[in-house]
């Protein structure tokens, strides 16, 4: 089954479907625009469920601010890695190459960096040089704004707006060594109104590395357009946690739209 001709540069590869688990104090939480967080379950149990459903990868985002709960995240990653045998990406609160080393030792395969990399861009190169570009995922929380590209970077889980052009920052980070872009639309996050396709296309045009589309998935027919806009993978949270769809449902919809998926 051929992939859509409008897909990104990795179109000959299978599209990845990635559940995202936001973790606070050892529990998965969900909300809209990072607000009004509600408990959604045990992270290890959910990770195992999604693995059994056929997820291609898993992403954990540590949304906890305290040092005490940070240690809990290492335990979550370690326990998950013992039961789930697909790539694990972990982000949130990563501020140094030593943080990366500890997460990798706990069982993570890739590490997402966001606010800390904006504050100190050299962090991207430090991670890539020490562990390889494939480990360094630049996570971007993006909103519409008055910049050349029309997209602005936010920090601290979308709560702080910057004046940084999102496309320019993504391009710079890739030059510094980022091996993948996790592109999350703050405007669409949790709304279930669909991915921001203009944002996905802008990131695809600016980058040679894989692009993961995030934010806005709500219907099965939302996923294929994100791939057609240039994404290599699609990430979602609330539609999986609420049992609205399974991973298999999403892969079926992608296959029906002509995309290659792993079964």
Curated annotation (Swiss-Prot):
It catalyses: 5-[(5-phospho-1-deoxy-D-ribulos-1-ylimino)methylamino]-1-(5-phospho-beta-D-ribosyl)imidazole-4-carboxamide + L-glutamine = D-erythro-1-(imidazol-4-yl)glycerol 3-phosphate + 5-amino-1-(5-phospho-beta-D-ribosyl)imidazole-4-carboxamide + L-glutamate + H(+). Its EC number is 4.3.2.10. The active site is at residues 22, 141. Keywords: Amino-acid biosynthesis, Cytoplasm, Histidine biosynthesis, Lyase. The keyword Nucleotidyltransferase does not apply. Pathway: Amino-acid biosynthesis; L-histidine biosynthesis; L-histidine from 5-phospho-alpha-D-ribose 1-diphosphate: step 5/9. The keyword rRNA-binding does not apply. GO terms for cellular component: cytoplasm. Its main location: cytoplasm. Coiled coil: none annotated. HAMAP family: HisF. Belongs to the HisA/HisF family. PANTHER family: IMIDAZOLE GLYCEROL PHOSPHATE SYNTHASE HISHF (PTHR21235:SF2), IMIDAZOLE GLYCEROL PHOSPHATE SYNTHASE SUBUNIT HISF/H IGP SYNTHASE SUBUNIT HISF/H (PTHR21235). IGPS catalyzes the conversion of PRFAR and glutamine to IGP, AICAR and glutamate. The HisF subunit catalyzes the cyclization activity that produces IGP and AICAR from PRFAR using the ammonia provided by the HisH subunit. This is Imidazole glycerol phosphate synthase subunit HisF.
């Amino acid at each position: 089954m051929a992939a859509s001709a409008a897909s990104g540069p990795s179109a000959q590869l299978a599209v990845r479907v990635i559940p995202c688990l936001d973790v606070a104090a050892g529990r998965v939480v969900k909300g809209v625009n990072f607000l009004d967080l509600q408990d959604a379950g045990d992270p290890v149990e959910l990770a195992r469920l999604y693995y059994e459903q056929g997820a291609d990868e898993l992403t954990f985002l540590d949304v906890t601010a305290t040092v005490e709960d940070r240690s809990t995240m290492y335990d979550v990653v370690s326990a998950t890695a013992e039961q789930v045998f697909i790539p694990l990406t972990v982000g949130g609160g990563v501020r140094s190459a030593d943080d990366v080393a500890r997460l990798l030792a706990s069982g993570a395969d890739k590490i997402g960096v966001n606010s800390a990399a904006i504050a100190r861009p050299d962090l991207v190169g430090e991670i890539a040089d020490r562990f390889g570009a494939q480990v360094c995922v630049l996570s971007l929380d993006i909103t519409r704004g008055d910049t050349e590209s029309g997209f602005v970077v936010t920090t601290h889980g979308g709560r702080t707006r910057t004046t940084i052009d999102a496309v320019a920052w993504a391009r710079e980070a890739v030059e510094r060594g980022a091996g993948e872009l996790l592109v999350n639309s703050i405007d669409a996050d949790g709304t279930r109104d669909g991915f921001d396709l203009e944002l996905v296309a802008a990131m695809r045009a600016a980058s040679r590395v894989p692009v993961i589309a995030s934010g806005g998935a709500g219907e099965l027919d939302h996923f294929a357009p994100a791939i057609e806009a240039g994404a290599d993978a699609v990430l979602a949270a609330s539609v999986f946690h609420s049992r609205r769809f399974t991973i298999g449902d999403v892969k079926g919809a992608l296959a029906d739209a002509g995309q290659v998926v792993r079964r």
